[in-house]
Amino acid sequence: MEFIVCNGCGCSPSKRQFFITACSHVFCETCRTTPTADFCHLCKIPTKTLKMDASLPKNVKKMFGDVGVMSTDIHKRLARVIGFQKIQKSIQLKMENKKSVMRKEQTKKVEKKTEEMHCQLSKLTSFEENNRKKLEDIERENEKLRNLISALELKVASSRDIDDDEFFMQGTPTSSNPSVAGSDVDNDELLDYDLLGLRNRSDSSSSNCSSQSNRGGSLF
């Protein structure tokens, strides 16, 4: 430890026992005890001191180690730290890449599903439009059929009225005196028409004629 000298008088450790303070100052045994043992003559403050021998703690001994050896050891430890962190970064990067690939695949699936849904929606819209047009066509046809049915009902009703009128016209006798002698119309046939009470009138006419002929043969 050629770089170590007493921070008070400048002597080397080979001549006296040395002590190190908590504030990182080194004093020989003479300077340490002047004026008191636990006092730093440079910082002018009370402090703890340790005897510089084999009983020093490891963390304090490192302060007196060989710089070359320490640098090599530090380099090795630093290399291990760098290697460890590099491996961790590589693993993290692989995981991120894997997640990125999965996200891309999921995005493609979602886009494909969205496209399929748009296609289905377009088909449904077209199907709905076609059905609407068909319903409109059916409604127009139904309207035509309703109009046709109404016209047929009116025509049938009108035809029934005409048939009834013709029936009554055909059932009425055309002769004004069906019971007169010499008529070409058969009295039996005329008597069958009782629509207007002709039977009673025929019986009455026959009775009158008989009565007149009986009177014609008698003076009284």
Curated annotation (Swiss-Prot):
**Positions in coiled-coil regions:** 124-155
One Pfam family, please name it: zf-RING_5
Record's keyword terms, sorted: Chromosome, Coiled coil, DNA recombination, Meiosis, Metal-binding, Zinc, Zinc-finger
| Tissue and organ distribution | Expressed in the germline.
Which Gene Ontology biological process is one annotated for this entry?
Answer: homologous chromosome pairing at meiosis
Q: Where in the cell is it found?
A: Chromosome
Single GO term (MF): SUMO transferase activity
Q: Where are the zinc fingers (RING-type)?
A: 6-44
- Residue ranges of the region described as Disordered: 166-186, 201-220
Report one GO cellular component.
chromosome
Which intervals carry biased composition (Polar residues)? Answer: 171-180
Is Glycoprotein among this UniProt entry's keywords? no
Q: Which InterPro entries match?
A: Zip3/RNF212-like, Znf_RING
Superkingdom? Eukaryota
Task: Explain the purpose of this protein.
Answer: Recruited co-dependently with zhp-2 to the synaptonemal complex between homologous chromosome pairs to regulate the formation and number of crossover events between homologs during meiotic recombination. Together with zhp-2, promotes the accumulation of pro-crossover proteins, including zhp-3 and zhp-4, at a designated crossover site along the recombination intermediate. Limits the number of crossover sites along a recombination intermediate by restricting the association of these pro-crossover proteins with other recombination sites during late prophase.
Q: How does it assemble?
A: Interacts with zhp-2; the interaction is required for their chromosome association and stability.
Q: What is this protein called?
A: Zip homologous protein 1
Lineage of the source organism? Eukaryota, Metazoa, Ecdysozoa, Nematoda, Chromadorea
